[in-house]
């Protein structure tokens, strides 16, 4: 009771340890659990076991749809921090974790466990933890990069997990309006650009159109690595001929299909790294012709953009959108696109403008 825990990040959130902790619900109280994006289709076992949050206080710095539902139900809280600052936030601005838990790939011959397709803020968490428990998953992919291993000498306990398949996400198909937006954007992208594409049906459709175009000699420097880049690679569009991290596809975490994970696994072209480097505006801007493509929720006539919340309901989190907008702005020949339909249709069939005179 009273412990402060971290559950891991993205595809590295723990499964078997979560299940084991949930079985102890009635004997524990005042246990705080932090994570970034619970990525599985079902809520964490601790939330299912404690729907009224009487024993566990669960907080995420970036909501998934499951976490949004739990937030509405009253047993999941939002942890407000900008993604790029998470490493420093956990290491310097939060209490020391009693236990950090994370899923990892099996140990290699050097005694290292690969962190899988995410580094993000891991080391801010791990450096500020009294105990570290790794849950070994034979399905966890090996992702090359930097700061992407933890050695057995740094680990207190090793749990051989049940080898749960990695969580996958399948982007929705772009609708007709999004397809038209994508057509406008692709006309403005030049050969030799470095790409950051957001997630969802719209950015994926942008990637599809680029793959079908005569644009070539492209590179990748992005927060989230998604299936769109796989399709661009298959189309022969990616050369990695950028100014920094040449020949590498650079990102801080990856999520997508199993096909994407299979491509990433033990692929020397991949470069996953810590978020404070990957999302650093000064690093991003070193790439010439940096192109950032993201969606937003609302915009007003003063140029203010809302990309995070609908009223009092938080949608995701404070990710790297601003970092890539500014990185593209500072880049030589860079371009940034924030995209949204002009209207949305409400449940009663009426239309509402997403372009406001002023945002609240």
Q: Language-model features: where?
A:
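Conserved alpha/beta enzyme-core scaffold
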Residues: 1-360
């Amino acid at each position: 009771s009273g412990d402060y825990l971290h559950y891991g990040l993205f595809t590295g959130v723990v499964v078997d340890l979560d299940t084991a902790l949930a079985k102890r619900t009635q004997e524990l109280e005042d246990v705080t659990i932090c994570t970034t994006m619970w990525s599985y289709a079902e809520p964490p076992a601790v939330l299912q076991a404690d729907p009224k949050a009487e024993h566990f206080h669960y907080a995420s710095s970036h909501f998934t749809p499951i976490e949004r539902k739990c937030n509405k139900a009253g047993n999941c809280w939002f942890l407000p921090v900008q993604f790029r600052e998470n490493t420093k936030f956990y290491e310097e601005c939060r209490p020391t974790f009693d236990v950090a838990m994370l899923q990892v790939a099996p140990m290699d011959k050097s005694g290292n466990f690969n962190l899988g397709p995410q580094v993000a803020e891991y080391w801010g968490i791990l450096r500020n933890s009294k105990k570290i428990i790794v849950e070994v998953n034979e399905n966890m992919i090996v992702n090359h990069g930097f700061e992407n291993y933890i050695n057995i000498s740094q680990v207190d306990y090793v749990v051989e997990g049940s080898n749960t398949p990695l969580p996958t996400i399948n982007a929705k198909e772009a609708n007709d309006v999004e397809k038209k937006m994508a057509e406008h954007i692709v006309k403005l992208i030049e050969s030799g650009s470095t790409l950051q594409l957001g997630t969802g049906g719209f950015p994926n459709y942008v990637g599809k159109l680029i793959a079908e175009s005569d644009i070539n000699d492209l590179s990748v420097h992005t927060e989230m690595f998604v299936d769109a880049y796989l399709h661009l690679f298959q189309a022969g569009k990616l050369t990695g001929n950028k100014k920094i991290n040449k020949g590498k596809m650079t990102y801080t975490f990856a999520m997508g299909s199993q096909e994407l994970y299979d491509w990433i696994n033990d692929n020397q072209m991949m470069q996953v790294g810590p978020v404070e480097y990957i999302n650093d505006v000064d690093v991003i801007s070193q790439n010439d012709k940096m192109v950032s493509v993201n969606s937003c929720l609302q915009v007003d006539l003063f140029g203010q953009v809302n990309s995070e919340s609908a009223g009092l309901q938080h949608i995701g989190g404070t990710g790297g959108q601003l970092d890539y907008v500014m990185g593209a702005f500072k880049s030589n020949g860079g371009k940034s696109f924030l995209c949204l339909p002009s209207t949305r249709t409400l449940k009663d069939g009426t239309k509402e403008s997403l372009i406001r005179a002023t945002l609240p």
